[in-house]
């Protein structure tokens, strides 16, 4: 029979020992290291996004130089998947089975993440803050170890259609979409709003990520008499679309562009800034080219990070503020873990974010999650290209499936 003093001693030991055990039992977690895995398109058709991974590398290096997190240095392992789903599967298996990472962070792409989601959930590996806006990443019952970060493409498309119908109740819409889950979410969002009118007013054309150009698709929509253009594709093809629409003399009354392809440096300037005047998109991040943020505290924090850690980075490239926003969200979660980096606790903290303000998010937009809300950002604001920068208009629009 244990006396009170022995019981207290046993209780103290019980509190201490599991923490040590967790560090030993959780893959990628030791007393001195936290291993985090990621796949990125450092090459291939979506390589413009590769700077996101490079930004993360620089950020974690900075964190380590300042002492790490909970006494541990972060070992960030990022592999190139070339935006190829079979390659993603190969690289993620390598990360999980050979590198034994604690979790996957910000893996990029809808088709690529779709190829690994069953595998990582079967392995119970946190697959968090994906760099993709597919609506399905919010399906917490279907894959409880996976969560996105940015607003979903479906919600974005719904916002565009609601705005369009307020301005033009009888549009003839040409919708160019990438033939994968990413592009199809926009089709679903447009259909959500138009309902039974969809087939009457929408002309659909798709393209493969391996296609060299989308010129023929643009000509097809123009010849069909569409007066509204919706472009749901990645940066390379978005730049081609803007340029081709202008060059053939097509002037749609409205041109909506997915917000994953609005970088000034990688889309608008290559397309020709004057060729995109009037294009409407949505935003949840501060635009690094907008003078409105020249003296903004959050953007000054990001610019200081860039100067010190990525001095040759393009300050016009919106992928960098995106990376800074999502990695700051991760750091918030890791701090909430309070040294317990078990996979279960990581997911517990991921699903308990309340009104988090992130330096590069627009004013009024906050990160929120719960065990039944795996859509961390559900607010957006419309903006229009004026030939030099994106100009926001209207208020912040809130809610998943608006």
Where do the language-model regions lie?
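Extracellular/periplasmic periplasmic-binding protein-like sensory domains
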Residues: 245-324, 396-400
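Immediate post-signal peptide segment of exported/extracytoplasmic ligand-binding proteins
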Residues: 23-36, 70-73, 165-170
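Extracytoplasmic "Venus flytrap"
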Residues: 29, 37-57, 79-85, 108-109, ...
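Segments of small-molecule ligand-sensing domains
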Residues: 308-321, 329-390
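Extracellular/periplasmic Venus flytrap/periplasmic-binding protein
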Residues: 87-90, 135-138, 143-248, 292-297
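N-terminal secretory signal peptides and thylakoid transit peptides that target proteins
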Residues: 1-14
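Periplasmic-binding protein-like
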Residues: 100-108, 128-130, 174-176, 226-235, ...
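Beta-alpha junction/loop-to-helix N-cap segments that form part of ligand/metal-binding clefts
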Residues: 48-54, 66-139, 149, 206-214, ...
